[in-house]
Amino acid sequence: MSLSNKLAITDVDLKDKRVLIRVDFNVPLDADKKITNNQRIVGALPTIKYAIENGAKAVVLMSHLGRPDGKANPKYSLKPVATELEKLLSKSVIFAENCVGKETEEIVNKATGGQIILLENLRFHAEEEGSSKDAEGKKVKADKEKVEEFRKGLTALGDVYINDAFGTAHRAHSSMVGVDLPQKASGFLVKKELEYFAKALESPQRPFLAILGGAKVSDKIQLIDNLLPKVNSLIITGAMAFTFKKTLENVKIGNSLFDEAGSKIVGDIVEKAKKNNVKIVLPVDYVTADKFAADAKTGYATDADGIPDGYMGLDVGEKSVELYKKTIAEAKTILWNGPPGVFELEPFANATKKTLDAAVAAAQSGSIVIIGGGDTATVAAKYGAEAKLSHVSTGGGASLELLEGKVLPGVDALSSK
């Protein structure tokens, strides 16, 4: 699956067309159904505005919200989003009470002049995800013919299909892969994701560095495996570094996290790195704690002393940070997935902050710096660095699967240029 040859919204003629856009409006709502964070709605605005400005007859928006498990549930209605959209766009938004069906088709077909129509939650139909849950919470597969019918119902609402929901791209749901229109293109959010991941995975400027954190080696094995033939250097940090240190160098790690299953593959990873000429950088000192809490008694340990029993490493120390900074400064492409420490707790946030500072400095001196979603995206947001980096991915699971070398159904379904 090539990421760089997919059709984008800018390649498609939208004049007088019904433009069907899969957006990600899965926003948090409070008990009064008020939106507590509208970031995802704001993120979709450039694509929506582009369709209107380029003469679309109707702009039809479809999304999921929460997990209603294939049944209509007012708690998960997208109606509050219609109100928010009207505010943000200063334009009227028609809310369709169902995402498919005769009435919805009539609303869409009557629309003119770039009218925006927001469809009700796709997941009110079991046919969107392909399954629902029964009263006991057991999964029930959706009827194949009904899934086909649902997909035809969505297809009937557009002339052109645009996918701007990268966070769901790893799911083969009906709205992601089942719309059968001649032109299926990416919106601006998905376009940017694909462009930047192509810059890392398909044609990186070298040296190419990957920074990988996280808890378990066994969780990241596919990621490491896919990146080793591509990168020049690899920083392994976060809790999973302890499994490497103990297995390779017999460093005492105290009560730090040790991944028994992961320890069995550490040797293979190191061999593969040697074969591919990849420099592996591991931490050499640690900030320790007697418990996993902000008020823990803290200490400091080096490789030579080891971490004493009763203590665990929750961050890496200054010497490690210096190593990371040097490696980051040498790289031209940097892909970061996973923080070095437990940044949510202030005493263990130092290395994460300093690694982020180094990444920002690299981006400002012309390197491409990509944050691969998840916890590291939270770090960038927490310290206000999003705009200072080349790209912060919006897809947690989708980014990870892409980095693992998996085909994303939602991307694969797009037309090629």
Swiss-Prot record:
Major place of residence: cytoplasm
Domain of life per record: Eukaryota
UniProt catalytic activity: (2R)-3-phosphoglycerate + ATP = (2R)-3-phospho-glyceroyl phosphate + ADP
Transferase listed as a keyword: yes
Biological-process GO terms, alphabetical: gluconeogenesis; glycolytic process
Gene3D superfamilies to which the protein is assigned, alphabetical: Phosphoglycerate kinase, N-terminal domain
GO molecular function per UniProt: ADP binding; ATP binding; metal ion binding; phosphoglycerate kinase activity
Entry EC number(s): 2.7.2.3
GO cellular component: cytosol; mitochondrion
Binding site for ADP: G214, G238, F343
Binding-site residues for AMP, renumbered to this chain: A215, K216, K220, A239, G313, E344
Subcellular location: Cytoplasm; Mitochondrion
Binding site for ATP: A215, K220, A239, G313, E344, D375, T376
Cofactors that this protein relies on: Mg(2+)
UniProt KW keywords: ATP-binding, Cytoplasm, Glycolysis, Kinase, Magnesium, Metal-binding, Mitochondrion, Nucleotide-binding, Transferase
Cited InterPro entries: Phosphoglycerate_kinase (IPR001576), Phosphoglycerate_kinase_CS (IPR015911), Phosphoglycerate_kinase_N (IPR015824), Phosphoglycerate_kinase_sf (IPR036043)
Residues noted as binding (2R)-3-phosphoglycerate in the record, renumbered to the chain: V23, D24, F25, N26, Q39, R40, S63, H64, G66, R67, L122, R123, H170, R171
Record-linked PANTHER family: PHOSPHOGLYCERATE KINASE (PTHR11406:SF0)
Subunit description: Monomer.
The protein's name: Phosphoglycerate kinase
Organism: Aspergillus oryzae (strain ATCC 42149 / RIB 40)
Lineage, uppermost ranks: Eukaryota, Fungi, Dikarya, Ascomycota, Pezizomycotina
